[in-house]
Design a protein with these regions (language model features):
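Active-site loop-to-helix "anion-binding N-cap" substructures in soluble metabolic enzymes
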Residues: 60-66
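C-terminal catalytic "cap/lid" subdomain
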Residues: 2-60, 72-285
């Protein structure tokens, strides 16, 4: 069994428990684990220390994301490189033979650069140019499988390798969706760790945790419940399952033994059957 674990970058997320669980899975249980990490909060904090205001834009479809100009891209690379090294060192300290890499290494995450993005400003649709972001179209699963076979635990992160005419350039991409594409390519279980227990039917009420999503009707309810940042995680869930992952779990990074707890039933569990159309379901009956 291969498990892909995405460690979030929010201020409220402590990676210590997750790193301990990765060590348990990799060393004690001899299971394959790939770690993917974010770091958006650290990027914002670094920009602010430099006197630069982080810029977020809204697309016409209502999705809010970072606008990554050239200066922000440089900070992004610096911050993510630092975070990656810290996580690798943390795992090495626990006896895990971890290897750090980003999406540019070996074209781990590859796709076209989006230099221009459609945005919604003051109720009007506009095109913003100069963005350094990309859309993942390919995952170098062979690279990860080679590392896993040789006993290493990959620790991966954005940026991705963006195709820009005849060049390959580092560009920003969402860490949740990076983890989704990697888990799909490896036919793995994806654990998305965040700063809440899972996905709530009522976003303001933790007692409404959605524990299991296995049918198209339950999937519709999940999509309706996802608001704000959780909406982006649901997009990642869909991409992972559509790409080949067998299950996605959204769980609390700050729980005791967060990964082991998630794999044992904690959090919100979404199965690939939730994305089957009604025609697919009826054909199987």
């Amino acid at each position: 069994m291969t498990t892909v674990v995405k460690i979030g970058g929010a201020r409220a997320v402590d990676p210590a428990g997750a790193l301990s669980d990765v060590a348990t899975l990799a060393n004690d249980r001899d299971e394959d684990v790939v770690v993917v990490h974010g770091g958006s909060t650290a990027v914002d904090e670094t920009l602010e220390r430099m006197g630069i205001e982080p810029e977020y834009v809204e697309t016409p479809s209502g999705v809010v994301g970072r606008f990554t100009d050239a200066e922000t891209m440089e900070v992004f690379e610096m911050v993510f490189g630092h975070l990656n090294t810290q996580l690798v060192a943390g795992l090495q300290s626990q006896g895990v033979d971890a290897v750090g890499l980003n999406g540019v290494d070996g074209k781990l995450l590859y796709g076209p650069r989006k230099a221009a993005v459609r945005v919604l400003e003051d109720g009007k649709r506009k095109i913003r140019r100069g963005d350094h972001s990309g859309t993942i179209k390919q995952v170098n699963a062979e690279l990860l499988e080679t590392l896993l076979t040789d006993g290493y635990t990959p620790v991966a992160s954005p940026p991705m390798a963006g195709k820009d005419d005849d060049e390959v350039v580092p560009v920003n991409t969402d860490a949740d969706r990076s983890a989704a594409h990697i888990s799909g390519a490896l036919d793995a279980t994806l654990v998305l760790l965040t700063d809440v227990e899972g996905i709530y039917a009522d976003p303001d009420d933790p007692s409404t945790l959605i524990e299991s999503v296995e049918t198209p009707a339950e999937w519709d309810e999940l999509e309706d419940a996802a608001e704000g940042f959780m909406g982006r995680k649901v997009m990642a869930v869909e991409e992972a399952l559509s790409g080949g992952a067998d299950e996605v779990i959204v769980a609390d990074a700050n729980a005791d033994d967060p990964i082991l707890s998630a794999l044992s039933g904690g959090g919100t569990h979404v199965r690939a059957s939730a994305l089957e159309s009604e025609s697919d379901t009826s054909e199987g009956e």
